[in-house]
């Protein structure tokens, strides 16, 4: 027989022993009560108690009554359990412990403690599972609250960017207010978590705005607060452009102002300034026929045949090519009459108009009114000096 059969036999033996002991105790109690009634009277029998030795003797008698006889032991052999569920080994100590009136007030089965212990263990195992489920539920509720709070904050930011919507006076709100429900403990915790989430700044939305504000503050200039005042003074390039346009007009129109023809001792005719010229000012154009060098040589040979004809030919180079201005023919232009001097107050300069070179005279220094206008012819050849000795000076 297995362990299950042995346990069942032990339980059955204990139950039978308990019943026999109860019967023996009841019989002894009746006999003792009758004896005391005879010895001490009825009052003592009614309120008397059984002594401890008597109870122990009764239990021992009950166990002895349930113990198998020698014939049964010899037939089964030592340690062999009965077929009717009883067992004779190591069962007496447990029976005594459970039947002792000092240790427990009532009778109970020996397996009750083991059952109760396993029951308590099952309860203890269930407590952590409940706590884990509760924590998971709280985390899920907290995450939902944070997400809802972030969505509401983003919606507020979008509405603020779009601008407030002004309702019409006759328009009624279509959405009705939802019914108010009493707040629960879970809602209160979710509300607290949502408030904490709202206190934290939203990095994805507010960071670019702060950066943009910093950029606009850095880009602030003085002109954002005060109007721009343009200077009335002209730049150097503007002045040069205006002077060039004025010279073009004077050359094309042929105007010659601020000078006159006068007779100079030892020289003949000369040009005198009638106004003051500053350094760099345009004075007059050396006007004549613009010809190339080949034509100039032919004319010069022709002019040499008549000694009364003066020399009014001026050679120069322009764009790597030699040209000549022939002012020999008599005209009313004053530039051809300005005399020579190595230390003159004017100098020649090329001025082109639409790609055509013009020879002009500008003031090399400040010229006062009444002063003769002079410039260096630049001819230092021996033949020229022999023909015109005044070129030395």
From Swiss-Prot:
Reported impact of residue 379 to A/N: Abolishes histone H4 binding and methyltransferase activity
Annotated ranges, domain SET: 257-378
GO cellular component terms attached to this protein's record: chromatin; cytosol; nucleoplasm; nucleus; polytene chromosome
The keyword Phosphoprotein is annotated on this UniProt entry: yes
Classification of source organism: Eukaryota, Metazoa, Chordata, Craniata, Vertebrata
Gene3D superfamilies reported in the protein's UniProt record: SET domain
Catalytic activity: L-lysyl(20)-[histone H4] + S-adenosyl-L-methionine = N(6)-methyl-L-lysyl(20)-[histone H4] + S-adenosyl-L-homocysteine + H(+); L-lysyl-[protein] + S-adenosyl-L-methionine = N(6)-methyl-L-lysyl-[protein] + S-adenosyl-L-homocysteine + H(+)
Superkingdom of the source species: Eukaryota
Enzyme Commission number, as recorded: 2.1.1.-, 2.1.1.361
Consequence of changing residue 375 to F: Alters methyltransferase activity, so that both monomethylation and dimethylation take place
Main location as per UniProt: nucleus
Protein name in the entry: N-lysine methyltransferase KMT5A
Composition skew (Basic and acidic residues), residue ranges: 72-85, 150-162
Result of altering residue 375 to A: Strongly reduces affinity for histone H4 and methyltransferase activity
GO process annotations (BP): cell division; mitotic chromosome condensation; negative regulation of DNA-templated transcription; negative regulation of double-strand break repair via homologous recombination; negative regulation of transcription by RNA polymerase II; peptidyl-lysine monomethylation; regulation of DNA damage response, signal transduction by p53 class mediator; regulation of signal transduction by p53 class mediator
Record keywords, A-Z: Acetylation, Cell cycle, Cell division, Chromatin regulator, Chromosome, Coiled coil, Methyltransferase, Mitosis, Nucleus, Phosphoprotein, Repressor, S-adenosyl-L-methionine, Transcription, Transcription regulation, Transferase, Ubl conjugation
Cell compartment(s), UniProt: Nucleus; Chromosome
